[in-house]
Amino acid sequence: MKREGVLYILSAPSGAGKTTLCREIIDIFPQLRHSVSYTTRTPRPGEIHGKDYFFVSMDEFHRMIDADEFAEWAEVHGNCYGTSIRTLEENRAAGVDLILDIDIQGARQLQERFAGGVYIFILPPSFEELRRRLNGRSSDSDEVISRRINAAAGEIRESRWYDYIIVNDQFSRAVEELKSVIIAEQCRTARVLDAVSEIFSMD
């Protein structure tokens, strides 16, 4: 029996480093695929359509909402983000594990819709460090940075319902902790019992 693919959902305040962590962990686990979200925001320097995000107009995004094409979607800091339900269902059925880089609103929607997801919250070491990282983004205005900092406190409070919390202070350590979570989840009894039962003829 083919194992169902696992959804690894990463959320964090903007600037905590979850996108960079996602990219790094996919290099470590080649069988793990990144679920590319749709967004209405403007691409940042170096971002590639279809790899980092599917960049679409607000009209196209709302057409997809009306057509019930999203497993989850949310408006965050004035921009819309969404995950294709078809992408999730096809990959899970094929036994492909996906890593999703999404906000708290979207994570809540997925929790209600899909069982067995692994929810991981990435924290910055402090608000001061978060502000420093956001200030390093040339694409964000002072107004946007202030709005993200103000939103971070509420977002961090939501971390209590996630399965795991990783503090991204030293990046290499955060990578190792995320790697450990994925390895542990791959060994979870509920995920491997069917395969083990077939091998050892367990009743």
Swiss-Prot record:
Enzyme category, top tier: transferase
Chain coiled-coil ranges: none
Family: Belongs to the guanylate kinase family.
Keywords from the UniProt entry: ATP-binding, Cytoplasm, Kinase, Nucleotide-binding, Transferase
Record's GO cellular component terms: cytosol
Top-rank lineage group of the source organism: Bacteria
Job of this protein: Essential for recycling GMP and indirectly, cGMP.
Designated name of the protein: Guanylate kinase
SUPFAM superfamilies according to UniProt: P-loop containing nucleoside triphosphate hydrolases
UniProt-annotated location(s): Cytoplasm
PROSITE patterns: GUANYLATE_KINASE_1, GUANYLATE_KINASE_2
MF terms (GO), sorted A to Z: ATP binding; guanylate kinase activity
Pfam families with a match to the protein in the record: Guanylate_kin (PF00625)
Domain Guanylate kinase-like, residue spans: 5-183
Enzyme Commission number, as recorded: 2.7.4.8
Catalyzed reactions per annotation: GMP + ATP = GDP + ADP
